[in-house]
């Protein structure tokens, strides 16, 4: 990531918008900002390609090219309190009902000499 700051010689709002739209369509551009005649472009970009495209629209000069400045991390003034871990949630599952056994009443003769009709 790098920041490219360019000085643009723009006289009207239309030229300013055209310059912004030209830079926005380049690959690798993350953000574009125009303030007081300065164009700030952030992203993985080639500064030479930006100037080459903008020279067709208006007079362009380099002001600076450099890496993105990361915001300073503030150190916490208060000491960190130890985080209390919430108790583990225990789920009580109801065991399934035991299977129901069906009694099969088979038919059989107790009299071995019974008559069988065929």
From Swiss-Prot:
Keyword Lipoprotein among UniProt keywords: yes
Stretches with biased composition (Basic and acidic residues): 69-86
InterPro entries: HIPP, HMA_dom
Gene3D superfamilies: 3.30.70.100
Propeptide segment residues: 116-118
Modified residues (Cysteine methyl ester): 115
Keyword annotations: Lipoprotein, Metal-binding, Methylation, Prenylation
Lipidation sites (S-farnesyl cysteine): 115
Superkingdom of the source species: Eukaryota
Segments for region (Disordered): 68-87
Coiled coil: none
Molecular function as annotated in GO: metal ion binding
Domain HMA, chain residue ranges per copy: 1-65
Function: Probable heavy-metal-binding protein.
Family under the similarity heading: Belongs to the HIPP family.
Name under which the protein is recorded: Heavy metal-associated isoprenylated plant protein 12
Organism: Arabidopsis thaliana (Mouse-ear cress)
Gene name in the database record: HIPP12
């Amino acid at each position: 990531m790098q920041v490219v700051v360019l000085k643009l010689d723009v006289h009207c709002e239309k030229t300013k918008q055209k310059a912004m739209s030209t830079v926005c369509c380049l690959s690798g551009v993350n953000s574009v900002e125009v303030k007081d005649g300065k164009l700030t472009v952030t992203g993985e970009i080639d500064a030479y390609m930006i100037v080459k495209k903008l020279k067709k629209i208006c007079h362009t000069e380099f002001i600076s090219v450099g890496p993105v400045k990361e915001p300073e991390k503030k150190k916490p003034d208060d000491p960190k309190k130890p985080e209390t871990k919430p108790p583990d949630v225990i789920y009580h599952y109801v065991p399934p009902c035991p299977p129901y056994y069906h009694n099969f009443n088979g038919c059989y003769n107790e009299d071995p000499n019974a008559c069988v009709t065929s």
